[in-house]
Amino acid sequence: MSKDNTIQFDISESKKALTREILTEVYDSLIKKGYNPVNQLVGYLISGDPTYITNYNGARSLVRKLERDEILEEVLKAYLGIK
């Protein structure tokens, strides 16, 4: 590779992977504590109230690393099959 070529960095793929990883961990923690993870995550996304998410395994801290609008964006893209 020549030193004159510009390398393009795609942050969206790493952001998508991080969002998926965090949501999976939060989902698993909610399941282990006996909660309905979909209902709890929807409550959090709508209200912004982190108490919808358990502290178990640091799930609440993890989900707060992501912006709610970014989570919704990734979920919507996945639902619609948009890359």
From Swiss-Prot:
Pfam families assigned to the protein according to its UniProt record, in alphabetical order = IreB (PF06135)
Q: Write down the superkingdom of origin.
A: Bacteria
Q: List the InterPro entries.
A: IreB
What HAMAP family is this protein classified in?
UPF0297
To which protein family does this belong? Belongs to the UPF0297 family.
**UniProt xrefs under NCBIfam families:** PRK05473.1
**Do you know which PANTHER family this protein is assigned to?**
UPF0297 PROTEIN YRZL
**Protein's UniProt name:** UPF0297 protein CKL_1325
Question: Which organism is this protein's natural source?
Answer: Clostridium kluyveri (strain ATCC 8527 / DSM 555 / NBRC 12016 / NCIMB 10680 / K1)
Ranked from the top, the taxonomy reads: Bacteria, Bacillati, Bacillota, Clostridia, Eubacteriales
